[in-house]
Amino acid sequence: MTDSTIRIAIVGAGGRMGRQLIQAVTQMEGVVLGAAIERKGSTLVGSDAGELAGVGLLNVIVGDDLSQLTDNFDVLIDFTRPEGTLEHLAICRQHRKAMVIGTTGFDEAGKAAISEAAADIGIVFAANFSVGVNVVLKLLEKAAKVMGDYTDIEIIEAHHRHKVDAPSGTALAMGEAIADAMGRSLKDCAVYSREGYTGERKPGTIGFATVRAGDIVGEHTAMFADIGERVEITHKATSRMTFAHGAVKSTIWLGKHDNGLFDMRDVLNLNEL
C-alpha cells in the first residue's frame, strides 16, 4: 500500500456499526469509501451506501460478493461474525488486501487463521477500537502489577440486548491484560459464571459478570477489591461512532505496513508507555 488515499470496503454496511463506519469514512481525511457489502438476499443490495448511512449520495453501490469487488478497495473493515469474517479473510489474503477486524467471539482456530493470514497481509485485530478502552487496558496492566496478587479481581460488562456473544471481546481483552501482567494465562484463572452453592471465592481467579439490556452501547468495569478498599477502572461508551473513528484511523496507520498482526495499542503507540 502507498501513502495515497486509502480506499475502504465495509462489510455489513447496512447494520448499526456498518452505517456508523460509512459516516466515519466521510468525516475523515485520507480515506474514501471504495466498496460496501451486504449479505446475499439482503434488500439493501443495489442501494447507494451513502444514502443508506444518511450521508448523501456516494456513488458506491452496495454489493453482495466481496470477491468481485477486490479491485475497489485497499483495506476491508469487518465488524460482522466470526464465520463471515474468516470467509472475508481468505479472500483478502488471496488478493493481498489489508484488514481491520473488530469482530469478536472467535475460537482458537479462528484466531490462529488470523495470525497465519498476517504473514501475507496487514491486519489490525482488536476487541475494541475506542481510544479510551485501549488506554484502560494499559491502566489495567499497571494496576495488576501493583495490586493483582492480593486483591479479588472482577470484570463487569453491559451491552445492548442484541449482542450475541458473552463475555464481550473487550471484557476478555481486559482479563487477558490483567492475567498477562501477572504472568498467568486467562484460561487458567477465569470464572465465567456462578450459580447455586459455589463455596468461597478462590484466590487468584478473575471473575466475569455480564448484563444484556436495552440499548447499552458498552460499559466495562474492572474491580480490584481488598478488605477496606477497592479500585474500579471503568469505561462507558455512549456512541458507536467512537469505535468507528478508531477503526478508520487504523486503516490509515495500516497503510504503512504490508503485513503483520497488530492491535489498537500498536496504532496508538501505547506499547511504548
Swiss-Prot record:
NAD(+) binds at G12, A13, G14, G15, R16, M17, E38, G102, T103, T104, A126, A127, N128, F129. One of its GO terms (molecular function) is NADP binding. (S)-2,3,4,5-tetrahydrodipicolinate binds at H160, G169, T170. Its EC number is 1.17.1.8. PANTHER family: 4-HYDROXY-TETRAHYDRODIPICOLINATE REDUCTASE 1, CHLOROPLASTIC-RELATED, DIHYDRODIPICOLINATE REDUCTASE. Homotetramer. This is 4-hydroxy-tetrahydrodipicolinate reductase. The gene is dapB.
